[in-house]
């Protein structure tokens, strides 16, 4: 009989008390020789991306039993970034990733499971589960809840949640009336699933395919498509193959696999949050992956698809109908050096074998390799005296083909102050809006800036104003928006010393971000800096603020 991890809690005379408890949980005599499987779900009623996952958990458990395993379901917490947006709730979003990873580690380690089926979907749940998978390194497969259908207005326009956020800006700017805003609200989110554009959740669930942690189709099959349930069933059965062949996450997620994930990210113009999360996943896998390496990937990978928010026409459902992630990767494989095709995946085959023959079905959605939107990827890491340790911009979602912006800073010490400034008309064409003390430590929690970016775009300033922050952006953000500025203001980074009127230059071609001040002037201002006073002094956020690291290292916790 093959020895299993779970034998720790079920084999031997001294485990009689353990078996007694397991029998009370429904385990039968014949089950004690079978692998124990953790069904790591994230069902929660208030998140539309997760409201349907209870049924997916049932499907997984049924499939595990059919394949000869014994399933046990657990749930993680979750935060809906859209609902948490614009108030203190957003400060809990990124920190929830660490709780998710820690809670999974706790349950799996305490109960000695043989493998995991992870069922995430929305923004921090997927990376939190991936971090746990790397940390635990037991056979694991991912199958997400799937994307939401795009909304459709009465006049036939496709819309998404980002359309609703931008509608608030248009309403503030007087270009949309209350009735128009209500229509966006009612039609923006028509089904369950992760929001319908290439936002953070869908970006990460697509990257799961490129990393090799999920079966093909994971990132794009709609939540309401019957094919999603079949994918859930097949994923559960595939885990049993991984257990039988002892294929573990760290066998799959290598440095080359992370290159592949970022290559897909560049081709799709994914969310800037993927940088933060993938660096954290790499850290858990014991891989030292630098921001500079991301630029190296971007330099050899073209941008092939523009989906919402970079496009008002194409959504995740369109990507799926055009061939999905496999078609994008297959198209990329036609360019030498764009992908490592020999990386292992949960299919037991290589990435190259998985994508062979997956041709693009619609070149309006996925451009051919010889006619990309740009020769370099849709994400760029910037460096300069304003961000010595790096900053991130989603170049694929910058409107009007703008590659350079120079203008005077208008500085806000919080997102709330910035929103007041935007609403009161303080932001003028040419400005560089600086929002600081919103990094991992300073926020605390590095809140997303979807409300400011959406209002700027909605007011018609999307091509006339830049935004720079040590916070981060929603995957639904677009425009000339630079986030993750490191070191952050709370750590005494240069962004803390910017004053109104300082001239900031952003150049995405040169990959630079600089403030036109001498080193001596920056040092003088630093000497007069009063330091950072934590905003939250009790509870989890206070502990998080004390121990979290920079965005440039993935916002992970110091041990």
From Swiss-Prot:
Protein name listed in UniProt: Dihydroxy-acid dehydratase
Domain of life: Bacteria
NCBIfam families the UniProt entry points to: ilvD, PRK00911.1
Gene3D superfamilies: IlvD/EDD C-terminal domain-like (3.50.30.80)
Function of the protein: Functions in the biosynthesis of branched-chain amino acids. Catalyzes the dehydration of (2R,3R)-2,3-dihydroxy-3-methylpentanoate (2,3-dihydroxy-3-methylvalerate) into 2-oxo-3-methylpentanoate (2-oxo-3-methylvalerate) and of (2R)-2,3-dihydroxy-3-methylbutanoate (2,3-dihydroxyisovalerate) into 2-oxo-3-methylbutanoate (2-oxoisovalerate), the penultimate precursor to L-isoleucine and L-valine, respectively.
UniProt gene name: ilvD
Source taxonomy: Bacteria, Bacillati, Bacillota, Bacilli, Bacillales
InterPro entries: Dihydro-acid_dehy_C, DihydroxyA_deHydtase, DiOHA_6PGluconate_deHydtase_CS, ILV_EDD_C, ILV_EDD_N, IlvD/EDD_N
Cofactor: [2Fe-2S] cluster; Mg(2+)
């Amino acid at each position: 009989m093959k020895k299993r991890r779970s034998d720790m809690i079920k084999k031997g005379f001294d485990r009689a008390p353990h078996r007694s408890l397991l029998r009370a949980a429904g385990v039968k005599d014949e089950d004690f020789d079978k692998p124990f499987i953790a069904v790591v779900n994230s069902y929660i009623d208030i998140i539309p991306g997760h409201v349907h996952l209870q049924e997916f958990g049932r499907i997984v458990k049924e499939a595990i039993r059919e394949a000869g395993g014994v399933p046990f379901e657990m749930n993680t917490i979750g935060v809906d970034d859209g609902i948490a947006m614009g108030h203190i709730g957003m400060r809990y979003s990124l920190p929830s990733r660490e709780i998710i990873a820690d809670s999974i580690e706790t349950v799996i380690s305490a109960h000695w499971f043989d493998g995991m089926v992870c069922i995430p979907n929305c923004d921090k749940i997927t990376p939190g589960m991936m971090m746990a998978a790397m940390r635990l390194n037991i056979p694991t497969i991912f199958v997400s809840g799937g994307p939401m259908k795009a909304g459709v207005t009465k006049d036939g326009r496709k819309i998404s949640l980002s359309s609703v956020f931008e509608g608030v800006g248009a309403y503030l700017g007087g270009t949309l009336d209350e009735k128009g805003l209500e229509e966006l609200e009612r039609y923006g989110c028509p089904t369950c699933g992760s929001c319908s554009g290439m936002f953070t959740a869908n970006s990460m669930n697509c990257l799961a395919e490129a990393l090799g942690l999920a079966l093909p189709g994971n990132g794009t099959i709609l939540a309401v498509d019957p094919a999603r349930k079949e994918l859930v069933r097949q994923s559960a059965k595939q885990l049993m193959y991984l257990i039988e062949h002892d294929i573990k996450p760290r066998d799959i997620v290598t440095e080359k696999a992370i290159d592949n994930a970022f290559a897909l990210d560049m081709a799709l113009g994914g969310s800037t949050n993927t940088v933060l999360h993938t660096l954290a996943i790499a850290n858990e896998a014991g891989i030292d992956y630098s921001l500079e390496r991301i630029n190296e990937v971007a330099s050899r990978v073209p941008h092939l698809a523009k989906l919402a928010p970079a496009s008002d026409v194409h959504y995740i459902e369109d990507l799926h109908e055009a061939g999905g992630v496999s078609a994008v990767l297959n198209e990329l494989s036609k360019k030498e050096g764009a992908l490592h095709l020999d990386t292992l995946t949960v299919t037991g085959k290589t990435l190259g074998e998985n994508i062979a023959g997956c041709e693009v079905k619609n070149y309006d959605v996925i451009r051919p390799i010889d006619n990309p939107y740009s020769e370099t990827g849709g994400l760029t890491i910037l460096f300069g005296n304003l961000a010595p340790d790096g900053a991130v911009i989603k170049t694929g979602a910058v409107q009007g083909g703008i590659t350079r912006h120079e203008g005077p800073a208008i500085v806000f010490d919080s997102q709330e102050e910035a929103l007041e400034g935007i609403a009161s008309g303080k932001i003028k064409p040419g400005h560089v809006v600086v929002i600081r003390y919103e990094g991992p430590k300073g926020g605390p929690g590095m809140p997303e800036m979807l409300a400011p970016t959406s209002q700027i775009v909605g007011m018609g300033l999307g091509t006339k104003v830049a935004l720079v922050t040590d916070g981060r952006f929603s995957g639904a953000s677009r425009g000339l928006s630079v986030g993750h500025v490191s070191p952050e203001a709370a750590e005494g980074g240069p962004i803390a010393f910017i004053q109104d009127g300082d001239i900031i230059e952003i150049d995405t071609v040169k990959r630079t971000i600089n403030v036109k001040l001498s080193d001596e002037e920056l040092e003088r201002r630093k000497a007069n800096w009063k330091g950072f006073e934590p905003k939250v002094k009790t509870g989890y956020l206070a502990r998080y603020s004390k121990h979290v690291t920079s965005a440039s290292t993935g916002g992970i916790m110091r041990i």
